[in-house]
């Protein structure tokens, strides 16, 4: 007896998907996003209104990859339909930070009174908006939004002081 490990992902109205040479493309009201999805023994079928991810063999490794590919496809479809957003908060006690966006870089000035600014890289087509003590990161690719937030958080990591006392930084407060 062979276990059925296929996963079906429903495609909402207004979103179109295609698969060409192992590159999965999703297009929706927010934009277009692509991702290469290939693994030995994993098959992806795009049918009307749904995507089916299946494996040739029902082994542990293939079952794990079917679930991974299904999650990637769900994230791509959700991104072009609704988008992703991450909210961060600027926290400081004594030295007020100056945070601004310059192209594909977030510039963090006066962090702990430092003279040189710190630079955090903005990944992909992600948009970063700074208003007061809040930083909002939006985009259609979940991985780019998350990596941009991680880059910003890592650039304000304190290494030479006790982190229990010096809690200055830019921290993730909400992911949606």
Curated annotation (Swiss-Prot):
UniProt entry keywords in alphabetical sequence: Ribonucleoprotein, Ribosomal protein, RNA-binding, rRNA-binding
Gene3D superfamilies registered for this protein in UniProt: Ribosomal protein L6, alpha-beta domain
InterPro entries named in the record: Ribosomal_uL6-like, Ribosomal_uL6-like_a/b-dom_sf, Ribosomal_uL6_a/b-dom, Ribosomal_uL6_arc, Ribosomal_uL6_CS2
GO biological processes: cytoplasmic translation
Protein's UniProt keywords contain Mitochondrion: no
A GO CC term attached to the entry: cytosolic large ribosomal subunit
Pfam families per UniProt: Ribosomal_L6
Keyword flag S-adenosyl-L-methionine: no
Subunit structure and binding partners: Part of the 50S ribosomal subunit.
Function: This protein binds to the 23S rRNA, and is important in its secondary structure. It is located near the subunit interface in the base of the L7/L12 stalk, and near the tRNA binding site of the peptidyltransferase center.
Family statement drawn from the similarity comment of this UniProt entry: Belongs to the universal ribosomal protein uL6 family.
Protein name: Large ribosomal subunit protein uL6
Organism expressing this protein natively: Methanosarcina acetivorans (strain ATCC 35395 / DSM 2834 / JCM 12185 / C2A)
């Amino acid at each position: 007896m062979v276990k059925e490990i296929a996963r079906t992902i429903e495609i909402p109205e207004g979103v179109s998907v295609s698969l060409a040479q192992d590159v999965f493309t999703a297009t929706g009201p927010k934009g277009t996003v692509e991702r290469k999805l290939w693994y030995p023994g994993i098959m992806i079928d795009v049918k009307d209104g749904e995507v089916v991810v299946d494996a040739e063999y029902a082994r542990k490794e293939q079952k794990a990859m079917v679930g991974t590919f299904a999650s990637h496809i769900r994230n791509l479809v959700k991104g072009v339909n609704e988008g992703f957003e991450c909210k961060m908060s600027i926290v400081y006690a004594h030295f007020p930070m100056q945070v601004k966006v310059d192209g594909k870089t977030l510039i963090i000035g006066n962090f702990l009174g430092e003279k040189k600014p710190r630079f955090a890289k903005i990944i992909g087509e992600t948009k970063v908006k700074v208003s007061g003590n809040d930083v909002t990161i939006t985009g259609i690719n979940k991985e780019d939004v998350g990596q941009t937030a991680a880059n910003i958080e890592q650039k304000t990591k304190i290494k030479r002081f006790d982190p229990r006392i010096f809690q200055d930084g830019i921290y993730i407060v909400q992911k949606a």
